[in-house]
């Protein structure tokens, strides 16, 4: 299973000389499953570069949206495969009593916000609400569950063979509670991240910033690390960086996170901050024990 980060920023794109190392594009993660199936997790501005990296040939792509805030869908109309008639795109997302997924996305992909409307996309595009039960895409088993954030919001777990990826980019698990005191069943997103090979998790705020943003739907560094420790994730990537944080500030946040992880008795190499174009590879099968 190959994973590549195409957009790691939260809220709004933050291009410029101070965000070169970690990137300024908003949320998008590319996942290539062991059978070659291609997934995109969210469609922020990072999906534009993901699309440009795809070969111009018939393909079936799945886009899994966590929610419909602009920073997670604003790249859809700049996704090159959507303008190829030979491409089939399946867009998954949260259900809402308000309107269908297609109709909610069409509010953005329509005038006056977009020069292109959903019905004008030349690709074969379909929209599906994520089921409450596990389902399959290619070689993977996919699970979606509601998590603590503003509006209908999902986190995802992707299991392919013996490897698992948990993707929870917008998440406030500590809202009104101490994570270390909660039982597992009361921790938002716990089942998605339990013993994950790789956890990509919201880490937007420093601990000093969080008190002014309680209820906004995002995590402080300490909350993200407590969540990772409680769930037993093997490796954690902090994601959805605040647009106000420069590369140097994120470097400092990363050092603080690793020091805190050492305090938990953990290996600091298992904690890192997500950077655009970073790649990870998870084995679909665990190595066999030596005989």
Annotated model-derived regions:
Residues 172-269:
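Cap/insert and terminal regions of metallo-dependent hydrolase folds
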Residues 1-169, 174-179, 189-190, 247-291:
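Binuclear metal-dependent hydrolase catalytic cores
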